[in-house]
Amino acid sequence: MTMLRRFEIYSLDPKASQAKVAAMHASMRNAQRYIPEVLHSAVGRNESDVALHFVWEHAYESAQSYQRYKVHAFHANIYDRYLLNDSPERIVTDNPYDVGLLGYSCEAPIYLLPPGAARRLVLLRLAEGQADFFRAITAEAQSRNPQLILSVLAENTFGTRWLDGVTQILETTTYSHIWEQGYESLAAAAAAGSDWRASAGAAVEKVIELWYELDAGYEE
């Protein structure tokens, strides 16, 4: 059965109270306590200079599990109040990066890191036909950096799908691919750098990078 790997990435309203931000953080970190369909839920605060502040990463066993999550009462009663444009309790903002919901399909939890590890998330728009070329670059980057303990490159299928996570409604999206990198520490993730960009050249048309420590609601 094909799993769905998913990210929600937000900029926070500077006027939002710390109490509300903390409440959203806790509700997303501990999502699997309230919505059984949610797997491997973790949150993080972005430490890069990209003005995106909050990342919620998680997964679903199947598209059907994801669809049940979307109509769960906890989603409507708790998450939507923090996120929806028409909610008076909204604490996130629109951002100039055209980033919000991203993700991909996989056959197993190939993305999984232990709690307390760090993620470096590279969002890319690759030129047409360059995915295999760039995949070789990711493999080379991992071979050169022993601190890069996990590397996954995948097409951002969530960016072009409807709310069911399956039905394609757009031909393209701003970031065509996601490169997940895993490190044992935030310091290692921050120090990893982007030397790979020189090799990628024109194959990469657009890119932003985020890194954060995993505050995980799951056990290793």
Placement of each model-derived feature along the sequence:
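Short S/T/G/P-rich N-terminal loop/turn motif that feeds into the first structured element of a domain
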Residues: 1-57, 61-71, 87-220
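Short, well-ordered, aromatic-rich surface patches in folded extracellular/luminal domains
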Residues: 75-78, 87
